[in-house]
Amino acid sequence: MAEKRVIMIGGGLAGLAGTMKLAELGVHVDLVSMVPVKRSHSVCAQGGINSVNDTTRALGDSEWLHFDDTVYGGAFLNHQPPVKEMADWGPKVIDLLDRLGVPFNRTQEGHLDRRRFGGTLYKRTAFAGATTGQQLLYALDEQVRRWESEDLVRKFEFWEFLGTITDDQGVCRGAVVQDMFSMEIRALPGDAVVMATGGCGLIFGKSTMSMICTGGANSRVYQEGAKYGNGEFLQVHPTAVPGADKLRLMSESARGEGGRVWVPRTPHDSRDPSSIPEGERYYFLEERYPTYGNLVPRDIATREIFDVCVNQGLSVETERLCVYLDLTHLPATTHKKLDGILNIYQKFQGVNPRQVPMKIFPAIHYSMGGIWVDYTKDETTGGLEHGAPNNHMTNIPGLYAIGEAEYHYHGANRLGANSLLSTIFEGLITGPSIVNYINSLKSSAADAPAALFDGAVRKHKDAMDELVGRTGDENAYKLHDELGRTMTENVTVVRYNDKIKETLTKIDEIAERFKRAPLADNGQWTNQNLSFTRALGDMIVLAKVIALGALQRDESRGAHYKPDFQIEGLDPDSGEDMTEQARRWCKQFQANNDKWLKSTIAEHTPEGPKLTYEDVDMSLISPRPRTYGLKGAEEIMKVWNSEFAKKPVETKKPVAVSA
């Protein structure tokens, strides 16, 4: 058999970690990226990376509690064995990064400094100022460049993924890519292809994601037969800065370091915020969620900000919706830790956030859903069976997916600082699985007939020629703006079925109009118009997966919030016995789980997405009510434990701890 070769699509943290691991195992890797790998979207990650550590362990923390926080925060929609494995690997991943030279912040004693992020009561988050993603990316790229110098890695930067190559047995044998300078289209034979292509924020027009995060690559493999899981679950980050071009993230680290979210109790109060007395400030997260305060899970913080601005009419400004994120009370030493994000705000808003509270509003930020992938559970540890060939393999043999591109780890809502852990962990753990898969093959991609690769290239050249020669009266950029506005208005923070139906109708309309959208540039050199227009067609396909999944899921779970199907808390003023109310609530919660605690699986058909539902692996932790700020939570948990739970869970009120 010829030398082993893997095609890695994407040069962010997942792609670099996977490339590094595969090269260590002696596998040749072709690393394909639309941008220089150091400009992958992972570079924008700010806040930190989670793991249990010695200090939190002394306070009662453990990998099991990290695992529990993750599935609880994800509303139990996460498959549990992969999540447990990730939590178990957390300390090892951070130790590896430390040894690779990542400049993590340290305490005066020289230990790694930690901050607390949302959805947990422990300071698990290691960080490098407010530019953690950049530091991790640079460290991993340094390792990849070492393997590049030893001819185990070839980088294809400024190359775009167009599609996979599958043989007559449906086995993935490589990828078709395009040089974004010369516009050359070529085939890259590979014994496996790994999608490490990130999220799909551009479907919503403006988001905190980079402009390359169209979801186009994921949509292409979906259209080629890969299943897509939980597409309707997208995270709307509570704190972003509105901009004319895009939305800029203000990291959760700002709240983790003591930042406070508030609005004046007087609507649209025009006074200098520093002159507004404490008694006239509404710290709504702290009042509603005294245990977690400003660090409730992101889906909850986002809905509260939306409610305060839209339903309560307490937006700071009248022309745009926003609340204050206030760091002015923090000392200069804390501001220094956050320089990375504070400088971004000052650069784009012209205001020094060290002296004046920031104005922020929620924005699309992360894709919990993604390409469906498989795994094998280790029955002894409850985690993953190391080296199992199907770990992170899609339903197409030889095609893998890792990082934000896949759907496993974060369920209905991702906890802050779990993303950097999951991306790197996935790259590392999938490497041996890919090697074992390749070793099981009877022949390599290099042995496949040339006609297989020539035919794949011809197909994509024909598609490009059709696009270049297209005529019509539509404009791709205007269509993208319409798509983004519709998706943002109707399929983000609050979702109503009538509005989602309107969105699906609009998507179909845009899809028809797209066929009449010619290129503004027919050039054969660095044609960005071609790349964008092609991606728009793929965004339209994926938008329908998202919207249809949202329409059919008649419940509220994590980031998917439908007020018409929300199970409200108890009413102590109703006169009805609280225990009886709690019992009815628990019955409704259990019935809802019986119906909807399942992953949405989309399969592409010419008529549109075909949706089915997959049971979630809950073999390690039984689901329980997600009671952040829920009225009557203590009574609900008391009844749940005594009458409904398969395994009793702790009901005492948690106390925030500091490490």
Where are these regions (language model features)?
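Conserved redox-cofactor binding core of oxidoreductases
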Residues: 93, 98-184, 196, 205, ...
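Glycine-rich loop(s) and the adjacent beta-strand/alpha-helix scaffold that form part
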Residues: 192-248, 317, 410-433
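Short beta-strand "acidic-cap" motif of Rossmann-like dinucleotide-binding folds
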Residues: 27-33, 230
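An anion/pyrophosphate-binding glycine-rich loop and adjacent beta-alpha core
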Residues: 220, 226-359, 433
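Core beta-strand elements of the Rossmann-like FAD/NAD(P) dinucleotide-binding domain
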Residues: 2-4, 183-192, 395
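Glycine- and aromatic-enriched mobile tails/lids
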Residues: 1-5, 18-21, 25, 36-38, ...
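Conserved N-terminal glycine-rich FAD pyrophosphate-binding loop of Rossmann-like flavoproteins
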Residues: 35-69, 235, 246-249
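Glycine-rich Rossmann-fold phosphate-binding loop(s) that bind the pyrophosphate
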Residues: 10-13
